[in-house]
Amino acid sequence: MEKLIILLLVASLLVTTDSVVKGKKAARGWLFNEVETCELGGLGDPCSGSGDCCCDQCLCSGSYEHCTQNPDRWFCCRTYGN
């Protein structure tokens, strides 16, 4: 019985942690229009093949976003338009 309770506690903790991580990712994505974090890349490099590029942040302007370069952290920024 004790093992079952411990197992349930561990399972609920894993689910909670997963939800929190997904929630933070979703919030960050909404804030910076981030699709995913890129391991490597540069200004204008393709990220997902749908007009995205690797960059450190997205600067929204009109119908598309400009990407700026930062070697420490890469985001995948979605462009809209040209």
From Swiss-Prot:
Expressed by the venom duct. Residues 1-19 form the signal peptide. GO terms for cellular component: extracellular region. It is found in: Secreted. One of its GO terms (molecular function) is toxin activity. Keywords: Disulfide bond, Neurotoxin, Secreted, Signal, Toxin. May contain 5 disulfide bonds. Probable neurotoxin. The cysteine framework is XXX (C-C-CCC-C-C-C-CC). This is Conotoxin Cal30.
